[in-house]
């Protein structure tokens, strides 16, 4: 949620920043609501002052034995009017809040201008894509041939965009998740969390999924619960309505959870394989930072994701999302894209974002400055560390052999009982 004072003070600046990210902003609606809110507050304060003055006069008249009935009637009318105005004020405040909840975050000044993913600048590349002596296959073909992925039975069980993992693929999925979590917890200082996989509407609103993106979510019929699209949602909201101590910052949580997405608007995209599923596993990183140091934390978080790919020996590149390609809650985002030889393309495997105080304002996440003073909003960050299914895709495609087998990266072998290679059953 944007700072109300910023909108009041610099509406043109906000409108320009949001236009840069392709979002139209009806400032006239906000201005009308805000002016009405302020007018109501001013009228209520004036009437309360009048009521207080009249109450004092009634007390004086009673002490003097004078007839205060006319003034008491006036007081009753003032109280009724104040109640009516208070009710209207709350309605207008709710309308302002609803308007604010639908407005995306403002891009940081360091974010490049652009209209689409075609305008995202590349930051760096790591690793050299392997030169194959044969035509590399896509992961779904290899995984099916080796008996590890079963899309046909998944379709029978649930429908399209689901997968059944068997034998080595199930074990590799678990191995990847454990490797990711172990690295984040033991080396990067994250606290491991197992959160609920269902959350309520307030929690979804806190991180920005609601109210705007309800069609992208799975809601439990008859319950006010949603399946989480990412562990960012429960991890960030662990501190909703909390006041942290500045000494606690920065702090980080990591979780491995299933994620559930409707993939609305993705019809026809990545219809085969594991790239775009309704249910997938992801290890998520969430950090809470001091406002003056949150962009340093973003660079650290990106590094925490990159080191996993480096240890797996998977080539990747990092891009900065331009203004027109950013997520709703983000002030700045890096995408990390892993090389998939079967597709002859880099595909996203991690997205690391600094949301500034945007989510903190929605969820009420504050910290108390070390030197005292009024609590301030913390900055929140989130990043994939990593998408487990896509990591499995990358391992299969990059480590495939001409005989159809797949070599297991050395870093995963301790998690897979020393297995070195996957061969046909």
Curated annotation (Swiss-Prot):
Pathway: Aminoacyl-tRNA biosynthesis; selenocysteinyl-tRNA(Sec) biosynthesis; L-seryl-tRNA(Sec) from L-serine and tRNA(Sec): step 1/1. GO terms for molecular function: ATP binding; serine-tRNA ligase activity. It is found in: Cytoplasm. L-serine binds at residues 230-232, 284, 384. Pfam families: Seryl_tRNA_N, tRNA-synt_2b. ATP binds at residues 261-263, 348-351. GO terms for cellular component: cytoplasm. Keywords: Aminoacyl-tRNA synthetase, ATP-binding, Cytoplasm, Ligase, Nucleotide-binding, Protein biosynthesis. Homodimer. The tRNA molecule binds across the dimer. Catalyzes the attachment of serine to tRNA(Ser). Is also able to aminoacylate tRNA(Sec) with serine, to form the misacylated tRNA L-seryl-tRNA(Sec), which will be further converted into selenocysteinyl-tRNA(Sec). Belongs to the class-II aminoacyl-tRNA synthetase family. Type-1 seryl-tRNA synthetase subfamily. Consists of two distinct domains, a catalytic core and a N-terminal extension that is involved in tRNA binding. This is Serine--tRNA ligase.
